[in-house]
Design a protein with these regions (language model features):
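Metal-ion/cofactor- or nucleotide/acyl-coenzyme-handling active-site neighborhoods
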Residues: 1-277
Length: 277
């Protein structure tokens, strides 16, 4: 289910089509580079990302860092400039995010080397701000309920990218479209770092439902939110279907995401040399 009405999403798309010059419009050939997908969960460890990147690069691998918007300021503060940042949120830039941050402040520090992978459903105010900052913008179309019937104004059938309810998981869909097959996931906890206070546990959302949930996964118990729980379900599905999609995955972190990885970790596929060839 989309987080804003379908009409809002359609209006955002119409406004963004003329604003963005470059679009991911076709699938690319497979490459052997690695994407570090960086989400903003409590276990996000920039030092570890730097060390892992260095180690792979010493072994001759090409590593590209793609982050979600909440991880962008953390990476920039630590002088780790991401290759790309994925944006999916259709809500206005002045609003307060689910992390309790005014969205516009996430883009205070933007490097021209970072490509912003902007979903066409993103609020146009985000595109305007990025243009003001002379950022590199590349558009893409996110498949959602609102665009099941196609996208007006794109001429032929637009390439729509699937892959999850949040920008972190949708990054894997984008990467797959661009020809990447190896993804290392950081900060995908899908749960809170600690138990909320009793007062906070009583909080409810606009629909009167509890904001915070305590869920059990395997032998673990985790505090999470509805949004993070949906992400956890997407993560579980990703782990189960990774081999069918020819994905090589690594998971670095803690929380509910780490427990799901422990339970559903894809079996490592054999190389042809296992038959003595």
């Amino acid at each position: 289910k989309d987080c804003v009405p379908s009409d809002d999403i359609q209006n955002n798309i119409k406004a963004n089509l003329p604003k963005i010059d470059k679009w991911i419009s076709e699938r690319c050939r497979i490459n052997n580079e690695v994407i570090f997908v960086v989400s903003a969960g409590p276990s996000l460890d920039v030092k570890r990302i730097k060390e892992d990147k260095e180690e792979l690069e010493e072994g001759g691998k090409v590593v590209k860092i793609v982050c979600v918007k909440h991880a962008l300021p953390i990476l920039m503060e630590n002088k780790l400039i991401p290759w790309a940042c994925t944006l999916l949120d259709p809500r206005p830039i002045e609003g307060v995010s689910t992390h309790g941050v005014v969205r516009s402040t996430l883009f205070d520090s933007v490097n021209p080397r970072t490509h912003f992978l902007v979903a066409s459903m993103t609020d146009p105010s985000v595109v305007d701000l990025l243009k003001e900052k002379k950022a590199s913008i590349i558009g893409w179309h996110a498949f959602s309920e609102a665009v099941k019937g196609g996208i007006e104004g794109t001429g032929e059938d637009a390439l729509m990218i699937t892959g999850g309810t949040n920008a972190g998981l949708r990054t894997i869909g984008i990467g797959h479209t661009l020809g990447f097959r190896e993804f290392h996931l950081y900060g995908f906890d899908m749960s809170l770092g600690e138990e909320p206070s009793e007062e906070i546990q009583k909080s409810v959302d606009e629909e009167g439902k509890p904001k915070f949930l305590n869920v059990s996964v395997g032998d673990g118990s985790y505090w999470t939110t509805g949004e993070l729980l949906a992400g956890g379900q997407d993560l579980e599905k990703l782990f189960k279907t990774a081999n069918e999609m020819d994905l090589i995955l690594q998971f670095k972190g803690t929380g509910m995401g780490a427990k799901l990885w422990e339970i559903e970790k894809p079996q490592e596929m054999k190389g042809y040399s296992s038959w003595g060839m």
